[in-house]
């Protein structure tokens, strides 16, 4: 992905990695560990749902291969000599590391705990409420922001409606 970002001169090509990689890696981990227990499939479904929501949100805002995230443009302008290092380490390597570390608990679970024959029903219910609740909060926040940005009267303004009224980043709250 980093090489494609260099070829297209666009570090934003790396952005969908956050959501697309787990959609591919988690099913591979499930297959690799052979942990086809109910709760493992449920965890897979939650990850896929979360990743699908994030990917759709990215696709909605994606303009074309020439569109570069303004933060990357600003970073390159402020630190032109450090840019190659910032690009590979900060924009490409760090997200790869974060996704890898974020998926380690799933690998550990699929490798060990998922072989249990019984499921703690309270744990399942709590996981379902937290997992689905987070995805719902993120989806609602994404929809509210999309609606806000579509209104030409809101150019340059900060969204202070809906979930955004109570939190600067409600979609991140859903992540937690």
Feature-to-residue mapping (PLM):
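Membrane-anchoring alpha-helices and their flanking helix-loop junctions
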Residues: 1-161, 168-176
